[in-house]
Structures are given as C-alpha cells and as structure tokens.
C-alpha cells in the first residue's frame, strides 16, 4: 500500500496525462465512428430541465472567464504587476501554445456545434472546446505557479481550489449554453491535461538547467 501511494505521489502528473490521453482517444475514436451522440444526449437530457433565465444569466457571466478578452486582460495585468520574469515568459508562451493547439485540433475534426440549445451564439467548430482547453491551461499553469510560491498553505490551497472550480464551471457553462457538446468539453479538458503536464515538465527542466548554470 505504501509503495503504491509513493508511486502515485511520484508520478502523479504523468498519471494525469495518461488518463487524459486515454479519455481523449476514447472520444476521438467514437467521433470518427459516429458513435458518440448517446453520451451527449444523455448529458443534455439531464441538463435541459435546469434551463431558466436567472441561471442562464449566471452561466453567461461564468463563461466570460474563459473568454479570450478576459484572459488576455488578466495576462496583461500579470505582465505589468508580476515580478517573476521567468513565470511571465512561460505563462505567456503557455497561453499562446494552447490557443494554437485548439485551432489545430478543431481544423482536424471539424465537428459542428450543437443545434438543440442556442442560448449563446458562437462561431467555428465545436471539438475540442476552446474555452475548456484555454481556461484549463491558463488557470492550471497559474495554479502550478501558486503551488510553488511562498504563499501560506491555506492561501495556496484556497486559490488552487478556486481556480479548479472556475475551470469546471466554465466547462459546464459551455454545455448549458449550448455552445458545446459534453464530449467537446471533456475532450478539451483531457487533451489539455496531457499538454499541461508536458509543458510543466518542460518548464521545470528548463528552470533546473538554469539553476545548474548559475552554480
């Protein structure tokens, strides 16, 4: 039991990436065989009864936290006020890379958006969800930085959990508003888990290399 827990702790990020890859592959295989609608229909049937004007307004606000302009605004604030030049560089690169990855993947799959619910008007293809991918990478990398910061543990965990909740709510908002299918959102989260782990490992190795150079 102790060995198992030690293995999980040591390889936690790689296990997340592996799980993300499996989920993404599962969804993609069913996309190509047109055998995925039952999953999206099941989720839609359990969400549609929640639709009401007040909740719609709430989710329209929540979804804006994954909006390009809002996240770019947050990025600019961090670039202006942040003191860690290394973090600012990697944070900006991360934002650009995941956006490009989303455009690339959408151009491959060319899945059309849902037509059953149209509480918000969106353009472009549906899979994988751009809001899900970019928000997960954006807030996820920010959470990684916070985790390794000098903040007190309660503050760290509060901010990390808060960002996790925001990302999940952004994903839910995309389904509720009819901008994406359930599998678009899960697909976006899963492939970003793979990307983010690889990117974090890359950043970590770069930082180690620089520390060795200084020594």
Where are these regions (language model features)?
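N-terminal transmembrane-helix/juxtamembrane module of multi-pass inner/ER membrane proteins
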Residues: 1-69, 107-109, 113-119
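Membrane-interface helix-loop-helix junctions at transmembrane boundaries of multi-pass membrane enzymes
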Residues: 2-12, 82-93, 156
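Membrane-embedded catalytic cores of phosphoryl/pyrophosphoryl-handling enzymes
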Residues: 3, 8, 118-215
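Hydrophobic alpha-helical transmembrane segments
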Residues: 15-16, 69-73, 88-93, 157-164, ...
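Alpha-helical transmembrane spans of integral membrane proteins, capturing the lipid-embedded, hydrophobic core
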Residues: 18-22, 91, 95-99, 189, ...
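Aromatic-anchored segments of alpha-helical transmembrane domains
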Residues: 22-27, 97-104, 165-175
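Alpha-helical membrane-inserting segments
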Residues: 24, 28, 101, 105, ...
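Membrane-interface loops
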Residues: 37-38, 80-152
């Amino acid at each position: 039991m102790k060995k198992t827990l030690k293995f999980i702790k040591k390889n936690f990020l790689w296990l997340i990436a592996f799980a993300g890859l499996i989920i993404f592959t599962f969804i993609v295989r069913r996309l190509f065989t047109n055998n995925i609608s039952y999953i999206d229909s099941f989720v839609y049937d359990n969400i549609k009864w929640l639709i009401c004007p007040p909740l719609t307004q709430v989710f329209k606000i929540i979804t804006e936290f994954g909006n390009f302009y809002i996240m770019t605004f947050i990025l600019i604030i961090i670039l202006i006020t942040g003191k860690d030049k290394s973090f600012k560089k990697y944070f900006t690169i991360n934002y650009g890379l995941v956006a490009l990855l989303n455009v690339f993947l959408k151009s491959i799959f060319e899945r059309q958006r849902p037509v059953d619910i149209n509480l918000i008007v969106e353009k472009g293809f549906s899979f994988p969800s751009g809001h899900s991918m970019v928000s997960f990478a954006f807030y996820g990398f920010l959470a990684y930085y916070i985790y390794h910061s000098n903040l007190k543990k309660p503050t760290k965990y509060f901010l990390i959990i808060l960002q996790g909740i925001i990302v999940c709510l952004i994903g839910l908002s995309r389904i509720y508003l009819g901008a994406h299918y359930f599998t678009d959102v899960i697909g976006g989260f899963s492939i970003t888990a793979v990307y983010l782990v690889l990117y974090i490992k890359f950043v970590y190795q770069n930082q180690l290399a620089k520390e060795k150079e200084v020594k």
